[in-house]
């Protein structure tokens, strides 16, 4: 059976290391980390990766007041990806766009903030915001993109821990091949630095990294003095199209997705299973028609 080839025609991102692919890549190659110390509720000063972008570039004051940080990151990344793709977006059928955004977790930030806020009023829930539920539903980051852009095609947020962004890309590829959409926005976002629970959780596991003098040296996984990770926020969204559609409009083709695979370790909550990892990679290479050896 013929399957359409799926290509990437646009990339948009925001990260502690930059707000464009060019800036992000240059900082990576130059060894720039841009980790800083932030003062986090109940935790004190902790190292974190903080994005530096202007959400007002694409959002109104009302959207920012009602929405979430994850939503702002998702909207910024999606809008930048659309611009990068060269699509005539405003004149396209928005019902033929799909939005598939992966996230590790969502809703913790908003719930923590509300509990803290009502603690000032003896935990009187009359002071609990009516925006809480729409902010914390799992599909929020993808949903905020559709509200901002006017996209009326399918959208949902995919939870797959640290692989959620990849899962979003795979879902987009499958929907394009099924003909459910003509263009897909897919990727991943995280607002984790806004949640003290994330930091406290990693600290309780002995996995929250520190460095005695330089926060930029905190993340050092291949160093014998390594002692944990750095929690960061950020997002990246790709524009995906069928190859024939991209070629027909003369699009700049950045890359092609030639293979993928998802599996499960089925062994532990956090410890990776090397056998399952190797199995997944070999299966992806097989789908791509590539020799693992």
Which residues fall in each region the model found?
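Acidic, glycine-rich active-site loops and adjacent beta-strand->loop/helix elements
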Residues: 13-14, 103-106, 160-164, 188-193, ...
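Active-site-proximal alpha-helical scaffold in enzymes
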Residues: 74-87, 138-149, 155-189, 229-251
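Conserved active-site and cofactor/substrate-binding residues in soluble primary-metabolism enzymes
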Residues: 19, 23, 65, 69-76, ...
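Conserved beta-ketoacyl condensing-enzyme motif
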Residues: 7-8, 25, 29-157, 189-199, ...
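Condensing-enzyme catalytic core mediating Claisen C-C bond formation in acyl metabolism
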Residues: 5-9, 29-37, 213-292
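Glycine-/small-residue-rich "gating" segment that lines the acyl/pantetheine channel
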Residues: 120-129, 170, 174, 178, ...
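Short glycine-aspartate micro-motif
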Residues: 6-8, 96-100, 182-186, 219, ...
């Amino acid at each position: 059976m013929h399957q359409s080839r799926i290509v990437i025609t646009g990339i948009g991102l925001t990260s502690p290391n930059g707000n464009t692919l060019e800036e992000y890549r240059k900082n990576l190659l130059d060894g720039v980390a841009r980790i800083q110390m932030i003062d986090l509720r109940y935790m004190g000063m902790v190292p974190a990766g903080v994005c530096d972008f202007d959400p007002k570039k694409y959002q109104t004051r009302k959207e920012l007041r009602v929405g979430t940080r994850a939503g702002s990151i998702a909207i910024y990344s999606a809008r930048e990806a659309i611009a990068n793709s060269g699509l005539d977006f405003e004149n396209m059928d928005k019902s033929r766009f799909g939005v598939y955004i992966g996230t590790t977790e969502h809703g913790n930030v908003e719930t923590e903030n509300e509990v803290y806020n009502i603690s000032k009023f003896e935990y009187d829930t009359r002071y609990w915001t009516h925006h809480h539920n729409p902010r914390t539903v799992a599909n929020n980051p993808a949903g905020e993109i559709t509200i901002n852009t006017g996209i009326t095609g399918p959208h949902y947020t995919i939870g797959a821990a640290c692989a959620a962004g990849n899962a979003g890309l795979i879902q987009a590829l499958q929907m394009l091949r099924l003909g459910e959409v003509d263009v897909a926005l897919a990727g991943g976002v995280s607002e984790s630095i806004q949640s003290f629970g994330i930091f406290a959780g990693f600290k309780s596991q002995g996995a929250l990294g520190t460095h005695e003098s330089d926060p930029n040296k905190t993340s050092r996984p291949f160093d014998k003095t390594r002692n944990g990770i750095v929690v960061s926020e950020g997002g990246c969204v790709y524009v995906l199209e069928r190859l024939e559609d991209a070629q027909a409009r003369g699009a700049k083709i950045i890359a092609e997705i030639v293979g993928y695979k998802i599996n499960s370790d089925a062994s532990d909550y956090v410890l990776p299973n090397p056998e399952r990892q190797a199995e997944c990679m070999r299966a992806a290479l097989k789908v791509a028609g590539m020799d693992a050896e």
